[in-house]
Amino acid sequence: MKDKQKKKKERTWAEAARLVLENYSDAPMTPKQILQVIEAEGLKEMRSGTSPLACLNAMLHSNSRGGEGLFYKLPGRISLFTLKKDALQWSRHPATVEGEEPEDTADVESCGSNEASTVSGENDVSLDETSSNASCSTESQSRPLSNPRDSYRASSQANKQKKKTGVMLPRVVLTPLKVNGAHVESASGFSGCHADGESGSPSSSSSGSLALGSAAIRGQAEVTQDPAPLLRGFRKPATGQMKRNRGEEIDFETPGSILVNTNLRALINSRTFHALPSHFQQQLLFLLPEVDRQVGTDGLLRLSSSALNNEFFTHAAQSWRERLADGEFTHEMQVRIRQEMEKEKKVEQWKEKFFEDYYGQKLGLTKEESLQQNVGQEEAEIKSGLCVPGESVRIQRGPATRQRDGHFKKRSRPDLRTRARRNLYKKQESEQAGVAKDAKSVASDVPLYKDGEAKTDPAGLSSPHLPGTSSAAPDLEGPEFPVESVASRIQAEPDNLARASASPDRIPSLPQETVDQEPKDQKRKSFEQAASASFPEKKPRLEDRQSFRNTIESVHTEKPQPTKEEPKVPPIRIQLSRIKPPWVVKGQPTYQICPRIIPTTESSCRGWTGARTLADIKARALQVRGARGHHCHREAATTAIGGGGGPGGGGGGATDEGGGRGSSSGDGGEACGHPEPRGGPSTPGKCTSDLQRTQLLPPYPLNGEHTQAGTAMSRARREDLPSLRKEESCLLQRATVGLTDGLGDASQLPVAPTGDQPCQALPLLSSQTSVAERLVEQPQLHPDVRTECESGTTSWESDDEEQGPTVPADNGPIPSLVGDDTLEKGTGQALDSHPTMKDPVNVTPSSTPESSPTDCLQNRAFDDELGLGGSCPPMRESDTRQENLKTKALVSNSSLHWIPIPSNDEVVKQPKPESREHIPSVEPQVGEEWEKAAPTPPALPGDLTAEEGLDPLDSLTSLWTVPSRGGSDSNGSYCQQVDIEKLKINGDSEALSPHGESTDTASDFEGHLTEDSSEADTREAAVTKGSSVDKDEKPNWNQSAPLSKVNGDMRLVTRTDGMVAPQSWVSRVCAVRQKIPDSLLLASTEYQPRAVCLSMPGSSVEATNPLVMQLLQGSLPLEKVLPPAHDDSMSESPQVPLTKDQSHGSLRMGSLHGLGKNSGMVDGSSPSSLRALKEPLLPDSCETGTGLARIEATQAPGAPQKNCKAVPSFDSLHPVTNPITSSRKLEEMDSKEQFSSFSCEDQKEVRAMSQDSNSNAAPGKSPGDLTTSRTPRFSSPNVISFGPEQTGRALGDQSNVTGQGKKLFGSGNVAATLQRPRPADPMPLPAEIPPVFPSGKLGPSTNSMSGGVQTPREDWAPKPHAFVGSVKNEKTFVGGPLKANAENRKATGHSPLELVGHLEGMPFVMDLPFWKLPREPGKGLSEPLEPSSLPSQLSIKQAFYGKLSKLQLSSTSFNYSSSSPTFPKGLAGSVVQLSHKANFGASHSASLSLQMFTDSSTVESISLQCACSLKAMIMCQGCGAFCHDDCIGPSKLCVLCLVVR
C-alpha cells in the first residue's frame, strides 16, 4: 500500500496520462477527461495550490511536440490527445484521410518542431498537406457537420503542429508547417481570405494577416467588382496551389469550415508566409496596409517585421474568421451582397458616370494637386457625404451596403468598426492630431454622416497611402460611402485613387502635409478613421466591412456616433438633450446624482451625467423611450429636476418611468396636473418610483445606502407594480417627494454645500461629513425623505410586501436597508436618529414605513390632489393601501405614520384606526421605543409639553402623531406612536410628524413649488381645494404647512444637522423632535432651517440670490442673514436660539423661528447659506414674516391662521423656509407667480403673512407658494384634489392646496397648532423640544420654526386634525374632516383615522405624499426636503438655472418636484403640470408635488438603476456641477455641458 502511495506521489503527469490513455481509454481524450480519470483512479497525487488541469495540459502539449513526445495531439481536434503509437490510426481516423498517418505524425512533429516541415520536401509538403488538407477538409466537411468546433479547435492546434498548417490553411499554420502544401494552402487560403477580407484589410489598413480577415471584407469589396469572385477570389488565387494540394477541399465559405476554428494568425506567420510561393506572397502583401509592407530594392513587396504580428492583422484574421463563422462568405450571402451592390450601383449609376479616382482627375489635375486642393473641399464634401472617392467606396458598398443595411452586419463589422476606430483614434491621436480632431470632431460634432465622412477622410487618406491596401481602402470607403458604389470604383486602383484623393480631401482638417505624411504613418489610422467616418456617415454598423481597423475606429466612433446621430445606446448626449426631462421624469439613476449637475433645465442631462454605465445607458434608453413621449414630462422633469433637483429627472423621470403613466401624468399632468393625477396617480406612482429611483439613488449615495435604496426601490418597485402604481405612486410619490425632496435635497442640498447641482450626489456624499452631515444630512434629510421616501417607499413597499410583520424588518431591515440605512443615513438618519432618539427600528419603521405609506398616501393624496378625481381612487387605493399600510401598520406604521400625516384625516382615520391601532401598539411601542430609545422622552416631555401644553396639540399630537406619525410619518403605529412620541417627545415632533410628515407631504407636494409651499401646497391643495375661504388660512396653512415643511425640513435639516441620525423625515419628525427638545429642536430646527435652506435652494431665488447661494454654499454665515430673521424670530427666538444653540438646529430653529431662513440656514453652513441666501431674499419678508409668523404663531397660533399660514412655529421653522420660502417662494412664487398671480400674490401675501407670521415663515413661503399653489390648486385641486385631499390632502393637501393645506401641517397644523397651539403654541414654542418637534414634525413648519412654533407645530400636529378641522373647516373638506380628524385625532385615534380614511380617501394620500413625504421624510419634501432638497434644488436651480427658469417657473414647482418627487408619477405629470400649473400656482403647486411624486416613482425606478450614485463624485469642468466620475466621464464634463456643447 505504501508502495502504491509512494508511486502515486512520484508519478509524473506524463506517466499518469500515459497510464490513462493506455489502460482507461482506447480513444483520444481531452486533458480534462484524462485528469478526471487520474483523479478518479488516484493515479497521481494532487498537491494543493497547483492547478492539475493546467499542469496536465502543459505536459500534454509539450509532450506532443517533439519526435520523442509520448503523446499525439489530434490535428483536427481542439485538444484530443492519444499516445503516439496510436496516433496514426486516430489521425487518419478522424480525418478519414488515408495516407495521412505519416503526414499526421509528420504534421504533429512538424508542428512540434517548426523546422521539420519547413524543410520537408515538396512531396512531403504535398503529402503532408494533402493529408492535412484532406484531413482538414474532410474534417471540416464531415466533422464540421457533426462537431466542427471540436475539429476546428483540434485542427487549429493540430494545425499548429503542421498538419493543420496544410489542412487548415488559416487554421493553425505552425511555423514549421509543411512549406509547400501547408503553406501553399495557407497562401491560397490567404489569398482567398484576403480576397474576401481585403476590404476588411484595407479598411483596417492593418496587416496582411488582417488582410486575411480583411480579405473577406476586401474580397467582398473587391468582389464588389465581382461579388461572386469574392469567394472565388480567394479561391482563385489559392486555386493554383490549392488545387495541387487539394486546396479546393478546404471550405472557405461556410460557417462549418474548419477555418472557423482556425487561428489565421497562427497559420500565417513570417515562416509560413515565406514558405509560400512568391506570387502568393505578393498577392497577400497587397492585402496588407501599406505601413505593413516594404518595397525591396528589387521592387518587390516585403513583409515588415510586425506586419503579421500586430493588432490590425490580428483583428483582420479574427474578423475574417468571424465573418466566415457568420456565413458572410457563403454563396447565398455573397449573392445577396452582390445584389445589394448592384442595387447600389443602379442607384448610384450617375456617380459611375462622373466617377473619378480622385477629385479633379477629369480636369487634368494630378493626384497630389487634387489632394492639396481638395483637402478643404473634400472635407466639405465629406461632410456632405458627396465625395467622389466616396463614390468609389460606394461601390464597395456592396459589403458596405449590407453592413449599412445591417443585414450583413456581422460581428466583424463591429469588430472592424472597433478596430478602425481604435486605429483611427490612435492615428488621429498621433499623426492626425489635427485630422483626428477634425475627423473626430466632425464625427462627433457632425451628424453621423459627417462623422462617417470625417472618418472616411482618414480612411481615404489611408487608402491612398495603401497602394497595396488600395482594395482595402476602397472597401473601407465602400462601407464608408456605400452611396458611392460604382463598378469602376470597385477597381482597387480607382478605389485607391478615389480614396487617396477623397481621403485626403476628406480629411480636410488634416493639413496637406499631414495628409501626405499620413499615407505612411497614418495610413492605418486614417484608414481607420475613414472606416469610422464611413460608419457614422452611413450607418454606425457600416464600418464593419471596413476592416478591423475601421472596426476599431468604429468602436470609438460609435460612441460619439450614437451621440451624434441616433441614440444607439441612447448616447448620453443625444438622449440628454432629447430625453432630459423624460429621464428626469423617469428618474433615471443616472440623473439621481447628476440632476444637480445639470444646471440646465434639462433634467435628463443632469441625470445622464449620473451614469454612463451600460446599465445606466440602458435604463436611460428605456426612460428616454418613455420620456420621449412626454415632453410635458420633460417639463415636469425639468421642474422636477428643478424641484427634484436631485432627481433632476425627478419630474421628467417620473413621467418617463410611468411611460404610459408618465404620459398620462405628462399629458394630464402637464395640461391638468390635478386631473392628470388620475393617470398621474399611477403615473405618479411609477414616476415617483422612477423619480425616487433617481432621487432615491442620490440619497443612497448620500446615504451610502444605494443598496438599500435599491432594495427599497426594488421593493417599492415590486410593491409598486403589484401594490398599485398608486401605491408606488404613493410610495413613489412620497419617494418622489422624498426623493425629489431628497434629490432636491441631495441636489439642492449638495448645491447648498457645493452650490453645484452635482453636489447633490457629491455634496450629499461629501456632505456626509460635517457638511455632509448637514448637507448630506440635508441630503440625508433629503435621503431622509428619500430614505423615508425611498426608504419609505422601499420601506413602504417593503411594508406592503412585509406588511405588518415587517414593520421592524421592513422598517428595520429593508427600510433599514433602504429605509433604515437610508433612513439611517438620510432617512436612516431620521431613522437612525429616530432610533437614536427613540428606536432604530421604530425609527426605521417610522422613517421607512412612515415614508412609504405616507408616500403612498401622499402619493395618493398628491395624485388625488393632482389627479383629484383620478387621484381619488388612487387615494382610495392609497386608502386601501393605507390599509395595507395599516396592515403593515407596523411596517406600514411608518407608512401609515406618513399616511396619516399626509392626511390628517386619513392619518387619524387610517393610522388612527389601523395606524392608530397599530400606532397604539406601535405608537406606544414605537413612541415608547422612541421615547425610550432616545432623549425622546426628554424631547417628549418638551414635545409632550408642547403637546400637552397644546392640549389639542397634545391630543392632536397624539392623534396627529398617531395619524401624523402613523399616517403622516407613514409609520402608522410606529410613526404615529413616534408621532405621538414625537409630539410628546418633541411636541413638535408629532406636530412635525403630521406637520412635518404631513407637511412633508405638503412639502413634498409643495416641494416643487416650495419646500414650504409644497407642504403648504399639499395642505394648500387640500385646503385650497377645500375652500377658497381658507385662503387666508391657506396662507396660514401654507405657512404652517410650509412651516411644517420647512420645520420638518428644517427640522430635518436641523435634525440632519443636529441629528445626523434622525435625519430622515421620520427621524426629523420623530428623531429630531424626539431626539431632544434641544437636539430635536436643534435637529428640527437645523433640519428645518436646512429644509428651509433646501427649500430655498429649491427656489429659484436661492439659485438667483447670491445671498442664498452664499448661504447655500455656507460662505455666508447663517447668522449674518439670521440676525434679521432672528429679530423676527427673536420672539420665538429665545427658544429657537436655545434650539439653535443646542445645535445648529436649535439656532436654526430659532433662526427658523426668528429667521425662517435663518433657521433654515442654521442647519448648516449650507443650510445657513441657504438660509442666508434666502434670508437676503426673504429676510425682510421672511424675517418679518418669520418673526411675525413666529410671533403670530407664538402669539396667536389660532390667529395666525392667516398668520397661521405662517403659523408662528411654521414660520419660525420656515423663516428659513420663509426666506427660502419667500425667496424660494419668491422665485417659486415668481415661477408660480408667473404661473399664477394669485399664486404669487397669495404666495407673497401668504408669504408676507407667513413671513409676517414668523410661525409660518415657511408657510409664508409655503403659503405664498401654497397659496400660489393653493389658489390654482384651490381651483383644480381644491375641488378635485381637495376633495380627496380635503380628506387626505385636507390635512396636508389642504395645507398644500390652501395656505392651510400645507398648514395641515403648516396651515392645518398651524390652524391646529394655531388653534391648539394658539394657546399652547407660544408655550410649546418656548418648549423648544416641543417646538422643535412641531417645528420639525408638525412644527417642521410651525414648531420647527421656533420653540413656540414648535408647540404650535405640535399643536398643529394635533391641530392639523383640528387644523384640518378648522382649516379644513375653513377649507371645506380638510377643515371638517381634518378638524374632525384633528379633533378626532386629538380626541381619538379613530377619528383621525376616519379623517385619515377621509384623507385617505383623497387628500390623505396626496397630503401624505406631499407634506408627509416632503415633510416627514424629505424635509417635508417640499420645504424641509427642499432644505435638503434646497441645496439640490439650488443646485438644480443653479445647475438647472436655465432650467430653473423653467423650473423657476415652477421654482415652486421645482421645489415641488424636489419635494414631491416622491409623489406620484403624476409628479412627472405634475412637474409638467407644475409647469402648467405653475401658471396657476396653486394648481401648479399641487401638480408639482404630484409630479414630484411621480418623479419619485421615477426616481425610485431610477434609484434602483443608478449605480453611479455610490461612486465618487467629481466636478464638471464646464459648469462646476458635481457628478459621479462615471457620469462625467473622461471629458470631465457633465451631461449637461456635453449636451450644451
Swiss-Prot record:
Residues 98-107 have a biased composition (Acidic residues). Widely expressed at low level. Expressed in heart, brain, skeletal muscle, placenta, pancreas, spleen, prostate, small intestine, colon, peripheral blood, leukocytes, bone marrow and fetal liver. Highly expressed in testes. A zinc finger (PHD-type) spans 1503-1540. Keywords: Chromatin regulator, Craniosynostosis, Metal-binding, Nucleus, Phosphoprotein, Repressor, Transcription, Transcription regulation, Ubl conjugation, Ubl conjugation pathway, Zinc, Zinc-finger. Its main location: nucleus. Residues 255-364 form the DEUBAD domain. Residues 94-169, 193-212, 393-546, 637-719, 775-883, 902-950, 989-1044, 1125-1145, 1195-1304 are annotated as: Disordered. Residues 243-246 are annotated as: Interaction with nucleosomal DNA forming a DNA clamp with BAP1. InterPro entries: ASX-like_PHD, ASX/ASX-like, ASX_DEUBAD_dom, Asxl_HARE-HTH, DEUBAD_dom. A motif (NEF motif) lies at residues 310-315. Residues 1107-1112 are annotated as: Required for interaction with RARA. It comes from the Eukaryota. GO terms for biological process: animal organ morphogenesis; bone marrow development; cell morphogenesis; chromatin organization; heart morphogenesis; hemopoiesis; homeostasis of number of cells; lung saccule development. Residues 641-671 have a biased composition (Gly residues). The modification Phosphoserine is found at S501, S503. GO terms for cellular component: nucleoplasm; PR-DUB complex. It holds the Pfam family PHD_3. It is linked to Bohring-Opitz syndrome: A syndrome characterized by severe intrauterine growth retardation, poor feeding, profound intellectual disability, trigonocephaly, prominent metopic suture, exophthalmos, nevus flammeus of the face, upslanting palpebral fissures, hirsutism, and flexion of the elbows and wrists with deviation of the wrists and metacarpophalangeal joints. This is Polycomb group protein ASXL1. The gene is ASXL1.
